[in-house]
């Protein structure tokens, strides 16, 4: 897709001829992640869709235990040290970012009171600064308030090379300062068309300054709270066995009204993709399993007459690469790269 075609597609969204969802799906097909697709529309002056959750809770709790299965189990619970989705998802039970993404690529606030935009003056005209306003009713699980000092600390923590944070790429080229206890400004060295990276999504989860400030830099791996998170999220830490089990209990002071629904959560790790699929679809031992890299015929067989269903969600992530092991130069029955041939090097 060239620039003219992209501009035409964006204009089609503006005029209503193409839906926002279809635009995002088209961009995914070209390898552009949903968040970046959403930012393209925002910078073109197309208002973000108003997102509402499908869940309309009337009270907090009452849903019993939620049991989920990640056959690649979490090995630590500090989001700045996450080495994959397994660690990010394990951490997300307890920690939260300022904002995240919905399934249509819309930015949605979490710890932020509102989203930065040019309309409200929190995105500078030159694209070199962003201002975040925090919610004022958020507490860490130990009762201390979340403030802008925590946000600034996460930048200092992650951008320090001696911390060896896996999130350093999101924080090393910015400057962050507190305007007041609930306002933070992020400055970029140059105009940033995609500013929603630091403090957003899986790489943007906020850890508490008062528990980690003594463990910056070279001492970062020694922090006891790397394995015992104290966050702002819907569940409070109960226990953790690396690679095996993460347990949380409902946070009675959670800042979102009537959430969460489930009273406890168990995130089990281990096994393989097939056994994970079977544990949900066939035996019903778990309520949900993620990353089912299983042949379609096996999933269909497990789903048919079983106790669950398979949800397939398109995305831009790369899980693995398969090499074509056939010979592209040898023709068999009028076909090149026939399965009847072998690649001269890769086979």
Model-assigned labels for residue ranges:
Residues 115-164, 185, 276-283, 343-347:
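Aromatic- and charge-enriched surface segment that lines or borders ligand/interaction sites
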Residues 167-216:
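Surface-exposed binding/hinge segments that line
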Residues 1-22, 29-31, 44-46:
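N-terminal secretory signal peptides
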Residues 92-96, 100-106, 200-266:
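Gly/Pro-rich hinge or "lid" segments in bacterial periplasmic/extracellular proteins
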Residues 67, 147-154, 181-187, 233-234, ...:
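Alpha-helical secondary-structure segments
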Residues 69-124, 156, 230-232:
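N-terminal lobe/hinge region of extracytoplasmic solute-binding protein
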Residues 71-91, 111, 166, 195-205, ...:
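A structural "hinge/loop" feature
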Residues 131, 223, 252-299:
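Ligand-site clamp/hinge motif
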């Amino acid at each position: 897709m060239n620039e003219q075609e992209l501009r035409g597609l964006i204009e089609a969204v503006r005029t209503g001829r193409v839906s926002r969802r279809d635009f995002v799906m088209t961009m995914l097909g070209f390898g552009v992640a949903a968040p970046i697709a959403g930012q393209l529309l925002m910078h073109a002056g197309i208002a973000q869709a108003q997102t509402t959750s499908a869940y309309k809770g009337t009270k907090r709790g009452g849903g019993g235990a939620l049991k989920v299965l990640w056959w690649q189990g979490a090995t630590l619970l500090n989001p700045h040290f996450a080495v994959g989705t397994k660690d990010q998802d394990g951490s997300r039970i307890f920690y939260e970012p300022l904002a995240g993404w919905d399934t249509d690529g819309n930015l949605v606030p979490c710890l932020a009171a509102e989203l930065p935009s040019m309309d409200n003056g929190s995105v500078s005209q030159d694209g070199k600064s962003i201002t975040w306003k925090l919610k004022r009713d958020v507490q860490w699980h130990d009762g201390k308030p979340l403030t802008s000092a925590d946000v600034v600390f996460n930048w200092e923590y992650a951008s320090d090379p001696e911390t060896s944070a896996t999130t350093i790429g999101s924080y090393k080229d910015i400057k962050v300062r507190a305007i007041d206890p609930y306002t933070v400004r992020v400055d970029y060295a140059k105009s940033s068309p995609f500013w929603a990276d630091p403090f957003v999504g899986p790489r943007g989860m906020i850890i508490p300054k008062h528990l980690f400030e003594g463990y910056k830099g070279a001492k970062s791996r020694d922090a006891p709270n790397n394995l015992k998170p104290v966050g702002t999220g819907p569940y409070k830490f109960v226990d953790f066995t690396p690679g095996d089990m993460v347990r949380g209990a409902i946070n009675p002071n959670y800042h979102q009204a009537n959430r969460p629904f489930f009273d406890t959560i168990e995130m089990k790790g281990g096994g393989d993709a097939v056994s994970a699929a079977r544990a949900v679809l066939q035996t019903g031992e778990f309520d949900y399993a993620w990353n089912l890299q299983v042949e379609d015929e096996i999933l269909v067989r497990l789903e048919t007459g079983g106790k669950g269903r398979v949800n397939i969600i398109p995305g831009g992530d790369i899980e693995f690469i398969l090499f074509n092991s056939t010979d592209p130069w040898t023709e068999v029955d009028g076909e090149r790269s026939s399965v009847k041939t072998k690649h001269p090097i890769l086979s």
